Amino acid sequence: NLIQLSNMIKCAIPGSRPLFQYTDYGCY
């Protein structure tokens, strides 16, 4: 689901760190 993925990506951005290190760091 692209909407869930998009929300997870937005929540996964912890500042200046690379996004791909936080693929399972999304909102739960």
From Swiss-Prot:
Its cofactor is Ca(2+). Expressed by the venom gland. GO terms for molecular function: metal ion binding; phospholipase A2 activity. Gene3D superfamilies: Phospholipase A2 domain. InterPro entries: PLipase_A2_dom_sf. SUPFAM superfamilies: Phospholipase A2, PLA2. Binds 1 Ca(2+) ion. Ca(2+) binds at Y28. Belongs to the phospholipase A2 family. Group I subfamily. PLA2 catalyzes the calcium-dependent hydrolysis of the 2-acyl groups in 3-sn-phosphoglycerides. This is Phospholipase A2 pseudexin C chain. The lineage of its organism: Eukaryota, Metazoa, Chordata, Craniata, Vertebrata.
